[in-house]
Amino acid sequence: ATSLSTPKLSTTLSSPTLHSLLYKHKFSLLSLSNPIKPLHFNFLTHSRSTPSSLSCTRRRFTAPRAESSNGADAPRHYDFDLFTIGAGSGGVRASRFASNFGASVAVCELPFSTISSDSTGGVGGTCVLRGCVPKKLLVYASKYSHEFEESCGFGWNYDVEPRFDWSTLIANKNAELQRLTGIYKNILKNAGVTLIEGRGKVVDPHTVDVDGKLYSAKNILISVGGRPFIPDIPGSEYAIDSDAALDLPTKPNKIAIVGGGYIALEFAGIFNGLKSEVHVFIRQKKVLRGFDEEIRDFVGEQMSLRGIEFHTEESPQAIVKSADGSLSLKTSRGTVEGFSHIMFATGRRPNTKNLGLETVGVKMTKNGAIEVDEYSRTSVPSIWAVGDVTDRINLTPVALMEGGALAKTIFAHEPTKPDYRNVPAAVFSQPPIGQVGLMEEQAIKEFGDVDVYTANFRPLKATISGLPDRVFMKLIVCAKTSKVLGLHMCGDDAPEIVQGFAIAVKAGLTKADFDATVGIHPTSAEEFVTMRTPTRKVRSSPSEGKAEHDIKAAAGV
């Protein structure tokens, strides 16, 4: 699934928006003009059991007779306390936690496949099978070519050019995915969750149909995630999406990647590192809309230096297949020929088609995202939703947070709202990006007066490798309170470094706290605690749209 600013939770559709790595996503919150029923958190009729008793006995909770939202009497007894449709990150987390709290839980999921469809999926969901994990494995594979180049300056010589075998990588990747989906199945089994293979569809507020068999449940959770979206242009049948790109039979010789978001940049880095010729076509002037402006500029420059060709302000219009099998991409500025593959990384859509949600009254946005309140409850009181299907912040750790919060809300008598403040994120481009907190533009708008610290330097490794690699780091600080509002980095190990600093930003530490921290030398990370002089001071009232910049010498250059 982001700018990752803190969303202000609201129950109106006019609430502030949040960018989700590339794309601008509105929080899908229910309109006050048609409010849902108030939450009643005493969902279970028995007294709360102690953790020790729950670990020994799986209890079947009996719900009192209730009037369902469609006016029909709900059944007195249910097959399950929770029935989850979709065994991705959020669904598995919610189901496992709910079961640990003593609820009877079932999960349905489609049969395993590396490529998703209306009839295939797999336990583990997008992240494990078609996203984070396989993508990161391919990133690892692609980085070796750059490391071979770096090693020459350190005295390494190769009598024979290292050879890469695509089929070996894909076979080993798929074996790892099979192992991981098995682990997820065991997690559910060990938690006492019933796993049902098949396609689930909501029949009424308390009934799910799985391939013709009906199951009743006190609560239903929708966690079906999203699917890649390819625009409908002439020749789109020749295009591939991110699912297919992770499982191609052969490595592309020359690939066009349409899109300028994090998925596009990650795959551009992968195929460039594997020695494919890579062209990236974007509609904007710069990549990564929704990210910090200086990060956008920096990563584009660095990726260009590695041989990736960017075609800016170009919109795809058609794909043409030649007699020799090669593909041509026609854009608003002309035609580029000779591609072996054309990949679209133009966003993802919630996977809500044919789930029966409209018929039971679940409200959705125009793009199919399920509208939920702050507790992940839909417009139908017994139906809930977490993860990418709600189009909030489309990140795996966020889906995990939402799933855990939902289980506490329903089954632990602990109404829990997911906390979207200062969610860290990464782009595994080459070089990679890590960020947490506000972008500079957001900080100025919200706080007015900010001090900006930046460093742009050649890392120690590059001084001997001879390659043009650089690192960019940025701190955004509230001038009045000295609180660190945002932290951004592009360079080797940025995601690993930012994960640690995310704790500091989340905890509300100040620039003085950073300054008082002893750095680890020699590292790139130490720059975050050694920047002393602001690159610029921005002085502006939050309510005014104007800002004055006091430019000073850049720190760390």
UniProtKB/Swiss-Prot annotation:
One GO cellular component term: cytoplasm
Chain residues that bind NADP(+): G260, I263, E266, R283, R289, G347, A426
Protein name: Glutathione reductase, chloroplastic
The record's free-text note on cofactor binding: Binds 1 FAD per subunit.
Disulfide bonds: C127-C132
Annotated spans, Disordered: 535-557
An MF annotation (GO) of this entry: flavin adenine dinucleotide binding
Quaternary structure (record): Homodimer.
Family the entry assigns: Belongs to the class-I pyridine nucleotide-disulfide oxidoreductase family.
Keyword Electron transport: no
NCBIfam families in the cross-refs: gluta_reduc_2, PRK06116.1
Reaction(s) this enzyme catalyzes, per UniProt: 2 glutathione + NADP(+) = glutathione disulfide + NADPH + H(+)
Positions with a binding annotation for FAD: S89, G90, E109, T126, C127, K135, G200, D388, T396, H521
Gene name of this polypeptide: GOR
Annotated transit peptide: 1-66
